[in-house]
Amino acid sequence: MARHLLLPLVMLVISPIPGAFQDSALSPTQEEPEDLDCGRPEPSARIVGGSNAQPGTWPWQVSLHHGGGHICGGSLIAPSWVLSAAHCFMTNGTLEPAAEWSVLLGVHSQDGPLDGAHTRAVAAIVVPANYSQVELGADLALLRLASPASLGPAVWPVCLPRASHRFVHGTACWATGWGDVQEADPLPLPWVLQEVELRLLGEATCQCLYSQPGPFNLTLQILPGMLCAGYPEGRRDTCQGDSGGPLVCEEGGRWFQAGITSFGFGCGRRNRPGVFTAVATYEAWIREQVMGSEPGPAFPTQPQKTQSDPQEPREENCTIALPECGKAPRPGAWPWEAQVMVPGSRPCHGALVSESWVLAPASCFLDPNSSDSPPRDLDAWRVLLPSRPRAERVARLVQHENASWDNASDLALLQLRTPVNLSAASRPVCLPHPEHYFLPGSRCRLARWGRGEPALGPGALLEAELLGGWWCHCLYGRQGAAVPLPGDPPHALCPAYQEKEEVGSCWNDSRWSLLCQEEGTWFLAGIRDFPSGCLRPRAFFPLQTHGPWISHVTRGAYLEDQLAWDWGPDGEETETQTCPPHTEHGACGLRLEAAPVGVLWPWLAEVHVAGDRVCTGILLAPGWVLAATHCVLRPGSTTVPYIEVYLGRAGASSLPQGHQVSRLVISIRLPQHLGLRPPLALLELSSRVEPSPSALPICLHPAGIPPGASCWVLGWKEPQDRVPVAAAVSILTQRICDCLYQGILPPGTLCVLYAEGQENRCEMTSAPPLLCQMTEGSWILVGMAVQGSRELFAAIGPEEAWISQTVGEANFLPPSGSPHWPTGGSNLCPPELAKASGSPHAVYFLLLLTLLIQS
């Protein structure tokens, strides 16, 4: 049940509670006034998991209206008094006037009152002085009517229990109201009063249940004056809009109000029974407030019980309910797998989500040549379920209102004519609530979905771990859009596969959903993968945004609470972040700032040349790596050596998310440079690389260094272990560079100055790259090391045309600002620099001249 404290809350008069937890103000021998009977409805012929009440069954039930609509329930306890919940009458700690409220009595349907129904204005509202919020108790209120109610068969007061009254644990009681029939699912027209049977739970049992991890990762301390009712397995409960209504129990032919609907965590969730205000606890306070009213509420003596009420044991253990969904004997043997058979079409794969409903893609049933509704002649349709001796017939097809061939709402629900008896062989998959947060690293697996071919290879190809939200959103989300925080619906869910994909395979004809496991329970997490060409699915539309629709249609789908909660500031970002810009070819240059040292430089490649040397490479596009020519080709060589490229390696270890990728090099492309051997080489890979946190292209910038960028040389500390290290550098202006090297440098050569203590961080034989991070977060490749120098790099910008023409998918960002280095002649070189080429002292002297030269 949605937390009732989220309702519009109003209250007016505050009054103390003398002796709130004391026994009755009357002795057990005192009798109530004879002129007021209570708790005896006239004989007659939602609430989560409930049903329509018969007219006149609950004549004390009232509807409290504010602003023209039903807000809360209440109970008539005397002709001039109504009992309800305090939280209904308070908004942000402010008490609202009683004159803004009205009470409807004798109402069965909010769409059409019964004979005898009438409305009364509210003269005063009284709440306990110590009420502050529902979790702290004292959640009750008394409403004094402006004029007495007209009593009759449809309007009659309920009995109230004395402080000494003891309701037996396990007693079947009834809650009533016009609240939501499920979370975020209002009671439909004609708004008939709902009733549901709930079992009273002892305080120790309730506390044990609420001490277990559950919805929203919250626990609760059950306080004196609180009462619990419901079932460990959930599915029957009060909900939003039922607040203030009565929980009544029959004893000796009378109905006593045991509780006032107060709050809960969700509606009908497992191991989260509803929490009610225990009316008996507040007998003295109620008597004090209504003193002088004639007739007042009736507190009859408790009828003699037929058996004693044993004291509930105080042990901390309790029998918790386990999920009834999502259990499979092994991955791939899914007991919820369903095949919808439509004459003349290939089977459509879906999933059993309740005893009576199957979820499948709506596109299976749409005519590609028509925008009309799917055919409604369902007599010939059949559904095949695991271990079922016969095919199930289809009674109804319900499409999502936004269903189409290629969007996130490509969903339909099929109702079976005969409900399935659930067993280990046939059970539904669990569905996530909207706030569900699938943890990075969760174990996931692809499952067939819709019409399509099966997997191309062993089942291990279907196994994956879930990427973190930042990576997934920035790879496949909208650039510049804020990354959803944990608990907010994500834009996409992204698997990182554990098994390397077979070279040359194509998954274009297969269709998949994404199942993810928590504590041994499988959830249908994602549906309809994003288009990925021949690659395995890279991203899925999250299902949790559709949970309310599925729940509304089925009224019984197994939406299950999150079962794994070990996340927080150390696991995933909890502050709002945005994604760097994309290019026309997609995301590039992404790196998580909090990445551990030595990992997650997703464009950094190891280029193994003919078994005798390893060069640094940079992934420019899914099928291309850039490296320094002098490292990958021997001087004078014209043949392509055997070269293998590795991505996603931090020394000897694979990255924790996204795993080692290897490709062969099938060709080497060099630009045409007159008279000189070009410093840069493009390596064409044998097949494209799946984009992931361990293999993602870097961005390129066509016009020098954007203002504000910070730059680094990225290489390896030792060539044998190849653990990545980054050395901070400043890129010198072209004028200083020309001064230092007397104009002997090839055009487009960059000079760098290492930060103090950074000179020897990287070994240079592998020709490391020069990178810069732009202010908005993107990383760009600026240059590759020149042979024999630690300070010189071949610039990428001048080769923009060649790279774009050769690669096609190179990620050049739009030019921003002006180049970092100004143009200028070497005739202005200070004499000290002109004589200092190669001298370390000259390099440090540059620090003193930086401001002068830049001016």
Curated annotation (Swiss-Prot):
Biased composition regions of type Polar residues, renumbered to the chain: 301-310
Entry remark concerning the domains of this protein: The first serine protease domain is catalytically active, whereas the second domain lacks the essential His residue of the catalytic triad at position 363, and the third domain lacks the essential Asp residue of the catalytic triad at position 679. The second and third domains are therefore predicted to be inactive.
Alphabetized SUPFAM superfamilies for the sequence: Trypsin-like serine proteases
S-S bonds: 72-88, 173-249, 206-228, 239-267, 348-364, 444-516, 506-534, 615-631, 711-772, 739-751
Stretches the record annotates as Disordered: 292-316
Gene Ontology annotations for the cellular component aspect, listed alphabetically: cytoplasm; extracellular region
Full protein name: Polyserase-2
Active site annotation, chain numbering: 87, 139, 243
Family named by the database record: Belongs to the peptidase S1 family.
Residues with attached carbohydrate: 92, 130, 217, 317, 369, 402, 407, 421, 508
Span of the signal peptide: 1-22
Protein EC: 3.4.21.-
Classification via InterPro entries: Pept_S1A_polyserase-2, Peptidase_S1_PA, Peptidase_S1_PA_chymotrypsin, Peptidase_S1A, Trypsin_dom, TRYPSIN_HIS, TRYPSIN_SER
Post-translational modification, as annotated: The 3 protease domains are not proteolytically cleaved. N-glycosylated.
Keyword match Membrane: no
Keywords: Disulfide bond, Extracellular matrix, Glycoprotein, Hydrolase, Protease, Repeat, Secreted, Serine protease, Signal, Zymogen
Provenance organism: Homo sapiens
